[in-house]
């Protein structure tokens, strides 16, 4: 076997099709784009256009609405809190709240508040103040000897108490 005997497998390297090179090539004149019109021009794809057929976004009914008063809570799991405690970024002895979680780097921001979820294992005894918590998270914190205080979300000045 010589170096000159080495060759690619058949069809391994397919030549690209050169378009617009005469009618004999099979891809001349319109270069496979059909006749004239918007789609024969470059850079055109009409999003959601289905060739005149009623498009999907108009075939389906409208549904739901956006609640402008909905509160957006940031979720944090127990394993993330335990990681921060192990890394000495959170003090298990003091009260853990949204502010201390952001300060420690466990959360990026607190939005409208923090919701505690129960993934992972919590070894440290903690006292935590959050705006919501899952049943499994509350059970895990209490099993470790800690407490969970559920806070009421702060109301805007315009809202009735």
From Swiss-Prot:
Keywords: Ribonucleoprotein, Ribosomal protein, RNA-binding, rRNA-binding. The keyword NADP does not apply. GO terms for cellular component: cytosolic large ribosomal subunit. SUPFAM superfamilies: Ribosomal proteins L15p and L18e. Residues 1-43 are annotated as: Disordered. The keyword Ribosomal protein applies. Residues 21-37 have a biased composition (Gly residues). GO terms for biological process: translation. One of its GO terms (molecular function) is structural constituent of ribosome. It holds the Pfam family Ribosomal_L27A. Binds to the 23S rRNA. Part of the 50S ribosomal subunit. NCBIfam families: rplO_bact (TIGR01071). Belongs to the universal ribosomal protein uL15 family. This is Large ribosomal subunit protein uL15. It comes from Bradyrhizobium sp. (strain ORS 278).
């Amino acid at each position: 076997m010589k170096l000159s005997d080495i060759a690619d497998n058949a069809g391994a390297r397919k030549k690209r099709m050169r378009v617009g090179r005469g009618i004999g090539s099979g891809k001349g004149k319109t270069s496979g784009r059909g006749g004239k019109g918007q789609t024969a021009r470059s850079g055109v794809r009409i999003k959601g256009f289905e060739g005149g057929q009623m498009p999907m976004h108009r075939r389906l009914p409208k549904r739901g609405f956006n609640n402008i008063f909905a509160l957006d809570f940031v979720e944090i799991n127990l394993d993330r809190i335990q990681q921060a405690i192990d890394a000495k970024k959170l003090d298990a002895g003091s009260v853990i709240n949204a502010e201390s979680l952001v300060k420690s780097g466990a959360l990026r921001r607190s939005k409208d508040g923090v919701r505690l979820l129960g993934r992972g294992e919590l070894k440290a005894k903690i006292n935590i103040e959050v705006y919501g918590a899952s049943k499994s998270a509350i059970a895990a914190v209490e099993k470790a000897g800690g407490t969970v205080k559920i806070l009421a979300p702060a109301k805007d000045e315009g809202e009735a108490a």
